[in-house]
Swiss-Prot record:
Source organism of the structure: Prochlorococcus marinus (strain MIT 9312)
Pfam families linked to this entry: Ribosomal_L6 (PF00347)
PANTHER family cross-referenced by the UniProt entry: 60S/50S RIBOSOMAL PROTEIN L6/L9 (PTHR11655), LARGE RIBOSOMAL SUBUNIT PROTEIN UL6M (PTHR11655:SF14)
NCBIfam families: L6_bact
Gene transcribed to yield this protein: rplF
GO BP, sorted A to Z: cytoplasmic translation
Name of this protein: Large ribosomal subunit protein uL6
GO-annotated cellular components: cytosolic large ribosomal subunit
Keyword terms, alphabetized: Ribonucleoprotein, Ribosomal protein, RNA-binding, rRNA-binding
Subunit structure comment from the entry: Part of the 50S ribosomal subunit.
Molecular-function annotations in GO: rRNA binding; structural constituent of ribosome
Job of this protein: This protein binds to the 23S rRNA, and is important in its secondary structure. It is located near the subunit interface in the base of the L7/L12 stalk, and near the tRNA binding site of the peptidyltransferase center.
Family to which the UniProt record says this protein belongs: Belongs to the universal ribosomal protein uL6 family.
Disulfide bonds: none
């Protein structure tokens, strides 16, 4: 049994969870999330909790047990609080701005890079160098933040580029030169 999968998912007051076979729908104050879960796992809704259990004792069911519990917990957290990822842009002349809903990043290329957000994702820019990606789906928020970071990943010599707010860049020493 999975240690993560054993613990039930608590459902807050303003959240409703609908279980229709393998389709789990979570509705809350921030929105609605729907997800098709993998086979080999069953769901039981008791009072204000959802209990996930494997249908068989095969390895695939046991592997998906903890995964499905974590996915449902992330869905519940997303519709109540939401998720956000912060990025920092480091470097002279590198900056970001929001035009309409789109994010425009100037990162040292000959052209600015425009990012179009998927449904449910919002971009927020503070002081031209701090970007916040927020939404209710943890997976999509993380993917969008990774796409923005991939425009100009941080380089190890001067640390220029786009990095996550809490990311530490491993710095390398430059050439030592002749002595």
């Amino acid at each position: 049994m999975s240690r993560i999968g054993k613990t039930p998912v608590l459902i807050p007051e303003k959240v409703t969870v609908d279980l229709d076979g393998l389709i789990v729908t979570v509705k809350g104050p921030k929105g609605e999330l729907k997800r098709l879960m993998p086979e080999g796992v069953s769901f039981d809704k008791k009072d204000n909790t959802v209990v996930v259990s494997p249908t068989t004792n095969k390895i695939h069911s046991r592997q998906r047990h903890g995964l499905c519990r974590a996915l449902i917990a992330n869905m519940v957290e997303g519709v109540t609080q939401g998720f956000s990822k912060k990025l920092e842009i480091v470097g002279v002349g590198s900056r970001a701005q929001v035009k309409g809903k789109n994010l425009v990043v100037s990162a040292g290329y000959s052209h600015p890079v425009e990012m179009i957000p998927p449904d449910g994702i919002t971009y927020k820019v503070e002081s031209n160098t701090n970007v916040t990606v927020s939404g209710i789906d943890k997976e999509i928020v993380g993917n969008e933040a990774a796409k923005i970071r991939s425009i100009r990943p941080p380089e190890p010599y001067k640390g220029k580029g786009i990095k996550y707010h809490d990311e530490r860049i491993l710095r390398k020493a430059g050439k030592s030169g002749k002595k």
